[in-house]
Amino acid sequence: MSKLNSRIPAGTLDKKWTDYKSKVRLVNPANKRKLEIIVVGSGLAGGAAAASLAEMGYSVKCFCFQDSPRRAHSIAAQGGINAAKNYANDGDSVYRLFYDTVKGGDYRAREANVHRLAEISTAIIDQCVAQGVPFAREYGGLLDNRSFGGVQVSRTFYARGQTGQQLLLGAYSAMSRQIAKGNLKMYNRHEMVEVVKIDGKARGIIARNLVTGEVERHFGHAVILASGGYGNVF
């Protein structure tokens, strides 16, 4: 079994990822199409990552063991998605969203990553709206918020009781656009067997075609594991 390093940047909690982004080496736009990225999983996390990376110009391969990305378990989410937009004007902030998320996870989450998620939560909502997700709106046209379990304020964006389904369809539509443009290649009915490591870095995967049973090897300059929560995680 491969042992992977999360490589969370050093520094104070609120500046780890901000400092890292300001100092990390950039990729020349002309070279992006030469870099291959493998995304394992096509739910909300994997689908959105695959579509976004393809939009940025990278060559992306996405794997899922279902017959379609639309069958990902993310469809089961109902309540909504949290973001620190403070539309309700009740004092919400990035820190309050961070605190509620860590506490709601029984303090088991990686705090640096949760803080980064809270920082970009507003951009995630904007991305979903741009993808066509029909969030509930007030009569004036603004996105509606409601209070959800484990939070101090009303910050949950929702689409009736079908939030997961609508978010997944939005990510799927973005993926379909990139597939049509040739930037993203989808591998349905494929199961990842092992991560390939070269010099301590993930450089590909071994996958099995669930239809033919054939074992395949796929190279990637980077590998993203978005294979699901407990029970499906690699």
Residue ranges and their predicted role:
Residues 32-35, 211-222:
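Core beta-strand elements of the Rossmann-like FAD/NAD(P) dinucleotide-binding domain
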Residues 2-20, 24, 65-203, 207-211, ...:
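Conserved N-terminal/central alpha/beta ligand/cofactor-binding core
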